[in-house]
From Swiss-Prot:
HAMAP family, sorted: HutU
UniProt lineage: Bacteria, Pseudomonadati, Pseudomonadota, Alphaproteobacteria, Hyphomicrobiales
Domain of life (superkingdom): Bacteria
One GO-annotated biological process of the protein: L-histidine catabolic process to glutamate and formate
Residues that bind NAD(+): 52-53, 130, 176-178, 196, 242-243, 263-267, 273-274, 322, 492
Top EC class of this enzyme: lyase
Keyword Nucleotide-binding: no
Classification via SUPFAM superfamilies: Urocanase
Cofactor(s) for this UniProt protein: NAD(+)
Alphabetically ordered keywords of this record: Cytoplasm, Histidine metabolism, Lyase, NAD, Plasmid
InterPro entries in the record: Urocanase, Urocanase-like, Urocanase_C, Urocanase_central_sf, Urocanase_CS, Urocanase_N, Urocanase_Rossmann-like, Urocanase_sf
Catalytic activity, reaction form: 4-imidazolone-5-propanoate = trans-urocanate + H2O
Protein known as: Urocanate hydratase
PANTHER family documented for this protein: UROCANATE HYDRATASE
């Protein structure tokens, strides 16, 4: 029987100013959907997989074709509804409504398990959208580089006096998200040893310049790390192997990194994590023939992996969970101390979230890198005092290879996002940019996610699992006029552990776009300030008052 998710075709986004849809507001999601499946962007485009285990852009290739046809035919007062990667309806709305509304992999809480999802998935009734895979705003590994960089820099401030020179970071996973780690480490001044079981993933990161070297033995990798750290030269190496085997061996040998984390796809025990002692071929075959055996073996391996991370933590090495839910699996497997080391958000990132600062990203629909370089200069012009951001933009231009449509990410917050959006829109209007820009973000943002083992871990008021906030964020972005809005479940940490929302807005140079941009790019980060102010964070309360937010049940107005 033919697999409806397999096709050998090659998809790439159109470039230039000629459009095949009826307006840029529908051409934009069309191009970004196609960009998600560009072979230079997606991890497994022939299977519709963008990143993150089985994070897909569309449910089947037939659904992809129907989405494309629907977008090309969509009028300026119509909205396309997409249910778990399947286009299910077109309805008349109005010009300021989103052109696309997306809901991916959402399940009633009692049934929000991998077992139930996988059953639906096999029947063709669901699709795992991850975060930006099914919401069509993945920009390649760059999308997580700055967040990882900010985490490593802050860890360096807290633990090493502000410098990571001569230090090295041990991690696992070089997929679409984990692949950011070696480059982020090098940008932060550190060396990085990343363990990865898939040689194709290592080669992908080498090809896109996210990784410097590869090694096939621990001895070879450690020789590089020792040489680089001694010279104070920040470089990275990908070690072919299984993290669940390599990390315990490093503990036994007394090897001591300066920081430990992990970004294997542990959120998905069947499709994302290679069990100890298994070959890649055996793993791939048994995922189809005996998924329960794969899951059992993978979960046991994750426990061993986390035990090794705890050994590093106990020896005084800064150790952090990077949001793949590996601690939860280890705890479920009987490792009571699995949560002794913290997640990266409460340890290093939450103060940024309190001010609505998060992963603001944009892509040039023209396909011309010069459009991104012009926007880089505009960001510096509008934020002249943010030298840290200027340094990031300089490093990004020098080190980050574009994947698919040229794009940029930089972390900015409430009060700055809408200013940048309006400036980009004016650049489109004036012809300074060759074609419209789309602005979006990761679902990992200050007001758009409930994920008790990641973004909302250890909230001050204990509201870690309250998921009203991402629902309100999606509703507000819809009401504000985002070009497309998405609401997902299970991204990052897997089924049952997160709900989150995303938005994208198109800057097409029109007055209508300017009005929408001002609303969306103010309201979206403002919900993050609101959420953290409600949880009792003084930084967020101060930010809310400084920005004049009206929060009657929070500020006591």
């Amino acid at each position: 029987m033919n697999n409806p998710r397999h096709n050998i075709r090659e998809v790439r986004s159109p470039r230039g100013t000629e459009i095949s849809a009826k307006s840029w507001l529908t051409e934009a999601p069309l191009r970004m959907l196609m960009n998600n499946l560009d072979p230079d962007v997606a991890e497994n485009p022939h299977e519709l997989v963008v990143y993150g285990g089985i994070g897909r852009a569309a449910r089947t290739w037939a659904d992809f074709d129907r989405i494309v046809a629907s977008l090309k035919d969509l009028n300026e007062d119509e909205t396309l509804l997409v249910q778990s990667g399947k286009p299910v309806g077109v309805f008349r709305t109005h010009k300021d409504a989103p052109r696309v509304l997306i809901a991916n992999s959402n399940l009633v809480p009692h049934w929000a398990t991998w077992d139930h999802f996988n059953e639906l998935d096999k029947k063709g009734l669901a699709m795992y959208g991850q975060m930006t895979a099914g919401s069509w705003i993945y920009i390649g590994t760059q999308g997580i580089v700055q967040g990882t960089y900010e985490t490593f820099v802050e860890a360096g401030r807290q633990h090493y006096g502000g410098s990571l020179k001569g230090k090295w970071i041990l991690t696992g996973g070089l997929g679409g998200m984990g692949g950011a780690q070696p480059l982020a480490a090098v940008m932060a001044g550190a060396c990085c040893l990343a363990v990865e079981c898939n040689p194709d993933s290592i080669d992908f990161r080498l090809r896109t310049r996210y990784l410097d070297e590869k090694a096939e033995t621990l001895e070879e990798a450690m020789e590089m790390i020792e040489r680089w750290t001694k010279a104070g030269e920040p470089k990275s190496v990908g070690l072919l192997g299984n993290a669940a085997e390599i990390l315990p061996e490093m503990v036994r040998r007394g090897i001591r990194p300066d920081m430990v984390t992990d970004q294997t796809s542990a959120h998905d025990p069947i499709n994302g994590y290679l069990p100890k002692g298994w070959t890649m071929a055996e793993w791939k075959a048994k995922r189809e023939s005996d998924p329960k055996a794969v899951e059992k073996a993978a979960r046991a391996s994750m426990r061993d992996h986390v035990e090794a991370m705890l050994a590093f933590w106990d020896s005084g090495v800064p150790t952090l969970d990077y949001g793949n839910n590996i601690r939860q699996v280890a705890k479920d497997e009987g490792l009571e101390r699995a949560f002794d080391f913290p997640g990266f958000v409460p340890a290093y990132i939450r103060p940024l979230f309190c001010r609505g600062i998060g992963p603001f990203r944009w892509a040039a629909l023209s396909g011309d890198p010069e459009d991104i370089y012009r926007t880089d200069r505009k960001v510096k012009e509008l934020l002249p005092d943010n030298k840290h951001l200027h340094n990031w933009l300089d490093m990004a231009r020098e080190r980050i290879a574009f994947q698919g449509l040229p794009a940029r990410i930089c972390w900015v917050g409430l009060g700055d996002r809408h200013r940048l959006g309006l400036a980009f829109n004016e650049m489109v209007r004036s012809g300074e940019l060759k074609a419209p820009i789309v602005i979006g973000r990761d679902h990992l943002d200050s007001g758009s996610v409930a994920s008790p083992n990641r973004e909302t871990e250890a909230m001050k008021d204990g509201s870690d699992a309250v998921s009203d906030w991402p629902l309100l964020n999606a509703l507000l972005n819809t009401a504000s006029g985002a070009t497309w809005v998405s609401l997902h479940h299970g991204g990052g940490v897997g089924m049952g552990f997160s709900q989150h929302s995303g938005m994208v807005i198109c800057c097409d140079g029109t007055d209508d776009a300017a009005r929408r941009i001002e609303r969306v790019l103010w309201n979206d980060p403002a919900t993050g300030v609101m959420r953290h102010a409600d949880a009792g964070y003084d930084i967020a309360v101060d930010c809310a008052r400084e920005k004049g937010l009206r929060l009657p049940g929070i500020l006591g107005e």
